[in-house]
């Protein structure tokens, strides 16, 4: 089995189990917020991530750190889920489980994820315009925007919705013009 296959065979059932617990307690969105909180902790602190995924770190130490960081900030069910991941030595898959839970939650709420890459930070007006355009294209009730900056685009934006990519960047236009000119030769 490849690393990806192993990862998905672990990540998906755990995320689905978390969703099941969340649904049975009417906490899907609240646990979604908890998941986002934990993901932001992992993405902003490499030290925390390394500490949690290190197999040599004692489980009691991992639990103590999570108690300090998250116990009072997240739903009891989600905190117990985190402890379960430590007990089962699955905490190394936490980031993947959280991302898959977010995908399940988006599906449940008829929300799409639009990954937007631009040369500069988007204004609120631009975010609103992109959100409206994506809603219209996808027929989704809501849109989650994930933005990133890439100065190599020169200008414009690239919007990725699932497997569909809309390249409205200057770099993309130059690449298409180059292909057209090359094909004429």
From Swiss-Prot:
It is a peripheral membrane protein. InterPro entries: ATP_synth_OSCP/delta_N_sf, ATPase_OSCP/d_CS, ATPase_OSCP/dsu. The keyword DNA damage does not apply. It comes from the Bacteria. GO terms for molecular function: proton-transporting ATP synthase activity, rotational mechanism. Its main location: membrane. GO terms for cellular component: plasma membrane-derived thylakoid membrane; proton-transporting ATP synthase complex. Keywords: ATP synthesis, CF(1), Hydrogen ion transport, Ion transport, Membrane, Thylakoid, Transport. Pfam families: OSCP. The keyword Transcription regulation does not apply. It is found in: Cellular thylakoid membrane. Belongs to the ATPase delta chain family. NCBIfam families: ATP_synt_delta. F(1)F(0) ATP synthase produces ATP from ADP in the presence of a proton or sodium gradient. F-type ATPases consist of two structural domains, F(1) containing the extramembraneous catalytic core and F(0) containing the membrane proton channel, linked together by a central stalk and a peripheral stalk. During catalysis, ATP synthesis in the catalytic domain of F(1) is coupled via a rotary mechanism of the central stalk subunits to proton translocation. This protein is part of the stalk that links CF(0) to CF(1). It either transmits conformational changes from CF(0) to CF(1) or is implicated in proton conduction. F-type ATPases have 2 components, F(1) - the catalytic core - and F(0) - the membrane proton channel. F(1) has five subunits: alpha(3), beta(3), gamma(1), delta(1), epsilon(1). CF(0) has four main subunits: a(1), b(1), b'(1) and c(10-14). The alpha and beta chains form an alternating ring which encloses part of the gamma chain. F(1) is attached to F(0) by a central stalk formed by the gamma and epsilon chains, while a peripheral stalk is formed by the delta, b and b' chains. This is ATP synthase subunit delta. It comes from Acaryochloris marina (strain MBIC 11017). The lineage of its organism: Bacteria, Bacillati, Cyanobacteriota, Cyanophyceae, Acaryochloridales. The gene is atpH.
């Amino acid at each position: 089995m490849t690393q990806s296959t192993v990862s998905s065979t672990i990540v998906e059932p755990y995320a689905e189990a978390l969703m099941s617990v969340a649904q049975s307690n009417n906490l899907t969105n609240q646990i979604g917020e908890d998941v986002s909180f934990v993901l932001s902790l992992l993405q902003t602190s490499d030290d925390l991530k390394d500490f949690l995924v290190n197999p040599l770190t004692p489980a009691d130490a991992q639990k103590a750190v999570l108690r300090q960081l998250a116990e009072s900030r997240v739903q009891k069910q989600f905190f117990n889920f985190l402890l379960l991941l430590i007990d089962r030595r699955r905490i190394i898959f936490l980031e993947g489980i959280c991302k898959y839970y977010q995908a399940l939650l988006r599906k449940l709420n008829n929300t799409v994820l639009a990954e937007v890459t631009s040369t500069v930070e988007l204004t609120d007006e631009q975010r609103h315009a992109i959100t409206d355009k994506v809603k219209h294209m996808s027929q989704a009730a809501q849109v989650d925007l994930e933005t990133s900056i890439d100065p190599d685009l020169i200008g414009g934006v690239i919007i990725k919705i699932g497997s569909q990519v809309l390249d409205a960047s200057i770099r993309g236009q130059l690449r298409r013009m180059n292909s057209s000119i090359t094909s004429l030769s």
